[in-house]
Amino acid sequence: MFQSSIYNKNYKKFLKNLKYQGEYAVTLGILAISILLLTGFNQFLNTKPTLKKNYFLNQKSIKNTLKNWNDIIATTANKYKVDEKLIKSIVYVESSGNPYAKSQSNAIGLMQIKPSSAGAEVYRLNGKKGRPSIQELYDPKTNIDIGTSYISFLQKKFISIKNKDVMRYAIIVAYVNGTSALLKTFSKSRKEAINIINTMTKKSFCTHIKKNTRQCKHFVI
């Protein structure tokens, strides 16, 4: 009777330890999977500060992926009277067609929209308060609509630039760095800056903005 009691206690203790070990193993397994998922997710979303990280492995993959957005781009380009090729070029260079791209400066999605700048500006122009959420900007249709609307705004802002190729590059640089940052490289006066730009060829304009020369080459369309 005494031995049976000891046996039962030891058996229960054994079962308890076995259950604990099992739960511990399951917990470790879940933790390991979670770490792998988070690591992959962070690699998928994040980019380096100075160089956009392409999620896709080669240009062929990127171009195939860009085809996914052709219909949205065509519809949105027609809506805002913006060249489809310009939109595609920005998507290609800014995100490689990855709708979940996110930079450390909080530029989001296919056209790398910053909620606090381009996003808020487009909202203001459309009579809306606030700014788009990050989740909204991960949606390809919303992202392309806001990005193209912002390009349309820049087209109107630079309408006085006579050379259309130069105007296109001015729009691209302003899209990436901001209008004020672009114009201030020429003059503190907006009018004077535009006058200087109007004396330039596409090549001399790109030479002037040396820090954006590589981007200009990427955007040749």
Swiss-Prot record:
Reactions accelerated catalytically: Exolytic cleavage of the (1->4)-beta-glycosidic linkage between N-acetylmuramic acid (MurNAc) and N-acetylglucosamine (GlcNAc) residues in peptidoglycan, from either the reducing or the non-reducing ends of the peptidoglycan chains, with concomitant formation of a 1,6-anhydrobond in the MurNAc residue
GO cellular component annotations of the record: membrane
Function of the protein: Murein-degrading enzyme. May play a role in recycling of muropeptides during cell elongation and/or cell division.
Signal peptide as annotated in the record: none
Name the record gives this protein: Membrane-bound lytic murein transglycosylase E
Annotated EC: 4.2.2.n1
Domain of life of the organism encoding this protein: Bacteria
A single MF term (Gene Ontology): peptidoglycan lytic transglycosylase activity
GO biological process: cell wall organization; peptidoglycan metabolic process
Record family assignment: Belongs to the transglycosylase Slt family.
Keywords tagged on the record: Cell wall biogenesis/degradation, Lyase
SUPFAM superfamilies xref list: Lysozyme-like (SSF53955)
Protein species of origin: Buchnera aphidicola subsp. Acyrthosiphon pisum (strain APS)
Top EC group: lyase
Entries under Pfam families matching the protein: SLT
